[in-house]
Structure formats: C-alpha cells, structure tokens
Regions:
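Sec-dependent N-terminal signal peptides
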Residues: 4-13
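Extended soluble regions of mature proteins
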Residues: 20-251
Length: 251
C-alpha cells in the first residue's frame, strides 16, 4: 500500500510539473477562409476568376497572463494575371498587418486592424459565452474537448486542451479552461487549426501590445469598412477573412 501511495504522489507531481511547464509558448495555426465576394456593375463579369478560399499562417504567443495573435510567415502569392473579353485582368491579394492582444486575467483586448492603408486600434472586452458539448478528439496528440457559442449571428465551435493550462486562443477567442487548438465558424466558412505547439522560452518582445493606429470602437470601424466597400461596389464588406483583394483591369 505504501509503495502505491508513493507512486501516486510521484505521478501527480510529474503531471503538475508538466502542466506548469506547458503554460507558455507559441502555436502556429493555419487559417482557411472561404471567400464570399459579390461584385456589381462591370466588375461582376470577373467574379468567376476569383479564388474560392484563402490559406494563411498565423502565430499565437501566450503565457498565463496574456497572449498575442498575429500573422505568421506566409509566402505572398504571385498576382493572378489573365485575359477576359479583350481586357488584361490582374488579381492581387494582400494580408493586412492585423494583431490581437489579450489580457487574459480581465479579458481586455486591443486589436490592430489595417484597412485600405490605414491602421486602427480597437479596444474591447471579450464576451465569449461558451457551452461545453462533451465531445472529445485529438489534435496534435493533445486530448481536446469541444465548446460552442453563438456570436454575431455565427456559430463558433472551439476545440481546447486542458493539458495546456492557458485560456488563450486564436484571434478574439479565449476564456476556456485550456488552450484553444482549433476554431470552426459556420461549418467550415472560416477554420483555424493548430499545426504545431512550441514551449520554448518566448522572446522578450513577443507579447508587446499594439500601439499604432487610430483608436476607434468596433462599431466605428465596422461603419468605416461598410462605407468604403459600398463605394467600391462590394456587398457585405467583401468577406475575405481580413485579406485585401485588389482587381486591376486594363483594356
């Protein structure tokens, strides 16, 4: 009996030590966004040339108190050039320099958003009302649990692992009892999936708060985007997952 008791203490100590070591690090994610772009007027004839999805790499730096989510290293795709109806068409996609900083203890977020060469800072409190479903699966050999919520008319599904004791997650998603390794919005319209987890010591400047840009509320930023998209003849803000898409036509 004494031997089993000692063994139990050693196993518990090992698990606690591992959990403590696994609360700080870096996660590389792949984001896949299904592109929904509606063009009006003369531009509508080029709709069938546009890509149907966009893949990018993202990185999350985290520790028990804070996290920073930003662009990872992705090769910029070459512009698509083609001819259509006697016109030369070039389509170029650019990834804006967006970042999301989260203070995990009070769920305060500072988001840096780049739009049409302008940079904005949006401060807010996160209100993620998660509900656990009881479903489980493995991601990168980590046991994960499923949680869901409704937010901004979208259904969000998250997979988090209690093995990594951080409430951080990609983008604005956080607040679960473990690191979020995957997000699915509206059955695959926007997915974010962890590709690797690294517990190496973070650089000292890895968790710097964004401080460049014009301070606006979320409502003000949404209005700016909607107005500009309306001027350009793009409906619904041109849902490209934050990617800037430019179409140049030469006749």
């Amino acid at each position: 009996m004494k031997i089993w008791y000692i063994l139990g203490i050693l196993l518990a100590s090992a698990f606690l030590s591992s959990a403590q070591e696994n609360n700080s690090g870096k996660v590389i994610y792949e984001q896949v966004v299904k592109l929904e772009i509606k063009l009006e007027g003369d531009a509508a004839q080029y709709a069938d040339m546009l890509p149907k999805e966009r893949k990018t790499n993202k990185v999350l730096y985290f520790n028990p108190e804070e996290s920073l989510y930003e662009n990872g290293k992705s090769e910029a795709p070459d512009p698509m050039q083609m001819q259509h109806g006697g016109s030369n068409v070039m389509i170029r996609m650019e990834e804006p320099d967006n970042k999301v900083y989260t203070a995990l203890n009070d769920t305060k977020q500072i988001e840096q958003r780049e739009f049409m060469s302008r940079v904005f800072l949006i401060e807010r409190k996160t209100e993620n009302q998660w509900k656990l479903t009881g479903k489980q699966k493995m991601i990168l050999d980590y046991p994960c649990q499923e949680a869901e919520m409704e937010k901004d008319s979208s259904r969000i599904t998250a997979w988090f692992t209690p093995v990594i004791q951080s409430q951080a997650g990609p983008g604005s998603y956080n607040g679960l009892p473990g690191l979020i390794l995957a997000i699915d919005t509206d059955n695959g319209k926007n997915t974010i999936t962890a590709q690797s987890v690294d517990f190496s010591e973070l650089p000292k400047d890895a968790l710097q708060k964004p401080d460049k840009g014009k301070k606006v509320t979320q409502e003000e930023f949404d209005a700016i985007v909607a107005e500009k998209m309306k001027e350009m003849g793009v409906e619904n803000g041109g849902k490209t997952g934050g990617t800037h898409m430019m179409i140049q036509i030469k006749r």
